[in-house]
Structures are given as structure tokens and as C-alpha cells.
């Protein structure tokens, strides 16, 4: 009996990259040959790569029955069984390579993903595309990571990270959204409910929570406080915000792009920055506070008189 191997759609981006020294097609070819079947590139039949099921079936029924379990996927149950089997096989191979999965069954990891030793992956974590993840990371729970290069010792907790590059010892989350096309340096923190898009964030900068950084370049050792927004879109075009090293951007600041904030600057909380800020300056862009003494009592008397 002859079989042809074709590209599968089990994974987001299934390629011919090797897993444990062989491509997926080579894995299946070897298994077919072991049980006495001929492999042919130009055969008419198409059979899917359910290697886990093939192994268990052959052990139970013997080599002669192997052909019965190689079949196309036509139903939802067949798809579920196939993807579950392949997922478990991939995850088990990662465990054998030194990755620490808290649950082999409850994490989805594409065949193209490469993960360093001693990285811990918690349940309900989805890692897809061509991800390269370093050693000693903590990923999840409840995280989505796709097409990323992530350094050693990073933590990504309850967050979405897509199409970005990240250095070593970064902390992301919980509930952060790292959108595509970011370059994030070493020891950067992007905390709760913060969003970063198409930006460069340099080493040791912190964005602790509740901030939006888009189309920006943020220098080293900066503090982007709670409620900071880079207003990058004017309804027609998107513009960039540039912040120099060691800048402190106070709470609830809006940076109206295009704008440059030089190094070693302070932006007062509540400011709306529309002009460049020079090195070493304190920028204050908010209306002056006015306190009206006795206003509450006067207001009460007026309401009483009217009634």
C-alpha cells in the first residue's frame, strides 16, 4: 500500500522545520516503514499525520492493521482527535528537552516553536507561529504568544504578545497587550492593562499600568506613569512620539504626536504636551487650580432660597 504525505493544517504555520531531528513528513514516513508499508511521494491517497494514534493502534492491533487508522479529517471529532494527539506529542517532546509544562494537555504549542530549558508554561497558554523563547521564562497562565522572539528569564502573565521582539528579564502583564512590531529591551516592565504598539522600548523602562504607547520610541530607564497616552493619530495620519533616556512622564499625561521629549526631563501629572520638551526641563501643561472658599455653603443657601 502506498501513501503520500501532504502539508497539514493542524498548526498556524506548519512548515518543514525539524522536530527532534526530523520533519513531520519524515516522522510519518519512518513510522509507516516500520510497520511494513511503502512510502511514495506520488501516490494517489492522502493520509494525515496522526502519529500518536498510529503508535498506540499498532501496539494494540499489530503492524498489519496500521493502514486502517490513517485517514483524512472530515468531521469535528476527527479534527479534535488529531489535533489533541499531535499537541500532546509536541508538548511531551518539549518536556523531554527540559521545558516545564504544568499541564501537557492544556497548553497549545505550534510545531515551529522553540523554547529554552527550564521555562515554565502554565495552563491555557497558546504559543503559535515562529516563536523563539529563551530559557528560564515563566509563561501564562491564560496567555497568547505568537511570532515572537523572547529572551531569557522573561515573565508573561495573562497577556497577549504578538509579532514582537523582547530582551531578557522582561515582565509583561497581567492583562497587557503587546501588539505587533515592537522591539522591547532588557528588564522592561509592561504592567496591568497597558498596551504597546509598533514601538521601541529601551532597557529598564517601566510602563506599570493603564497606559497606551503607540508609534513611539521610549529611551532607557524611563517611567511612563499610570494613564499616560501617546496620541498618535489625528484622524488622517499616525505620527511618532520620541522620549529620551531617564524621562519621567507623570500620571494622566497626553503626548500629542509628533512630539519629542528629551532625556532627563519631567512631565507634570495631568499635562497635555503639544510642544517639544528640552533636556533637563520640567513641563507643566494644565490649567491653574482655583479654590473658591465657602462655595458649598453658598450653593446650599441658593438652592434653599429657590425652593
Cite the ranges covered by each PLM segment:
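Structural signal for interior beta-strand "rungs" in well-ordered beta-sheet cores
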Residues: 100-285, 289-290
Amino acid at each position: 500500500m502506498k501513501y503520500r504525505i501532504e502539508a497539514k493544517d493542524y498548526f498556524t504555520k506548519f512548515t518543514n522545520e525539524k522536530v527532534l531531528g526530523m520533519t513531520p513528513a519524515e516522522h510519518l514516513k519512518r513510522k509507516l516503514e516500520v510497520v511494513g508499508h511503502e512510502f511514495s511521494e506520488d501516490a494517489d491517497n492522502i493520509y494525515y499525520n496522526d502519529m500518536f494514534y498510529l503508535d498506540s493502534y499498532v501496539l494494540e492491533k499489530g503492524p498489519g492493521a496500521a493502514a486502517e487508522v490513517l485517514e483524512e479529517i472530515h468531521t469535528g471529532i476527527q479534527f479534535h482527535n488529531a489535533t489533541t494527539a499531535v499537541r500532546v506529542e509536541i508538548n511531551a517532546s518539549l518536556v523531554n528537552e527540559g521545558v516545564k509544562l504544568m499541564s501537557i494537555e492544556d497548553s497549545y504549542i505550534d510545531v515551529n516553536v522553540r523554547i529554552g530549558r527550564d521555562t515554565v508554561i502554565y495552563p491555557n497558554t497558546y504559543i503559535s507561529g515562529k516563536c523563539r523563547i529563551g530559557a528560564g521564562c515563566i509563561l501564562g497562565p491564560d496567555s497568547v504568544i505568537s511570532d515572537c522572539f523572547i529572551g531569557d528569564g522573561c515573565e508573561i502573565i495573562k497577556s497577549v504578545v504578538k509579532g514582537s521582539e523582547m530582551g531578557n528579564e522582561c515582565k509583561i502583564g497581567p492583562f497587557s497587550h503587546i501588539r505587533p512590531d515592537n522591539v522591547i529591551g532588557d528588564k522592561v516592565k509592561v504592567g496591568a492593562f497597558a498596551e504597546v504598539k509598533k514601538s521601541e522600548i529601551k532597557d529598564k523602562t517601566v510602563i506599570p499600568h493603564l497606559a497606551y504607547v503607540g508609534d513611539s520610541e521610549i529611551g532607557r530607564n524611563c517611567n511612563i506613569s499610570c494613564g499616560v497616552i501617546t496620541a498618535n493619530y489625528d484622524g488622517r495620519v499616525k505620527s511618532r512620539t520620541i522620549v529620551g533616556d531617564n524621562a519621567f512622564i507623570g500620571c494622566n499625561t497626553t503626548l500629542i504626536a509628533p512630539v519629542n521629549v528629551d532625556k532627563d526631563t519631567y512631565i507634570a501629572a495631568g499635562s497635555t504636551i503639544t510642544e517639544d520638551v528640552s533636556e533637563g526641563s520640567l513641563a507643566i501643561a494644565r490649567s491653574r487650580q482655583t479654590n473658591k472658599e465657602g462655595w458649598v455653603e453658598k450653593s446650599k443657601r441658593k438652592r434653599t432660597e429657590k425652593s
